[in-house]
Amino acid sequence: MSDALSTLQRSVLEKYRTLADCLHELNDTLVELNTDSDTNPEQVLAQMREIEVKIALVGTLLKGSVYSLVLQRNMGKQAPGGKAK
């Protein structure tokens, strides 16, 4: 394997590192919730539902942004007469 990484490869590895850190943090939080005797399951469930709604909203906005960007790029590639360059 080459020692020199491309910019894209470094970016992907950084994203994986960030994802791994987030997953470790999530695991720590879940362990804490499972071992904490003062935790009310109904409260945790309500909080998880709120988080789920927020994540769904962010996902929808992200998909819309990506779709808009793709459309803009496709429109930019077309000539004024409607034919592709």
Swiss-Prot record:
Its main location: nucleus. One of its GO terms (biological process) is positive regulation of attachment of spindle microtubules to kinetochore. The keyword Cell cycle applies. It comes from the Eukaryota. Keywords: Cell cycle, Cell division, Centromere, Chromosome, Chromosome partition, Cytoplasm, Cytoskeleton, Kinetochore, Microtubule, Mitosis, Nucleus. GO terms for cellular component: cytoplasm; DASH complex; microtubule; mitotic spindle. Belongs to the DASH complex DAD3 family. Component of the DASH complex that connects microtubules with kinetochores and couples microtubule depolymerisation to chromosome movement; it is involved in retrieving kinetochores to the spindle poles before their re-orientation on the spindle in early mitosis and allows microtubule depolymerization to pull chromosomes apart and resist detachment during anaphase. This is DASH complex subunit DAD3. The gene is DAD3.
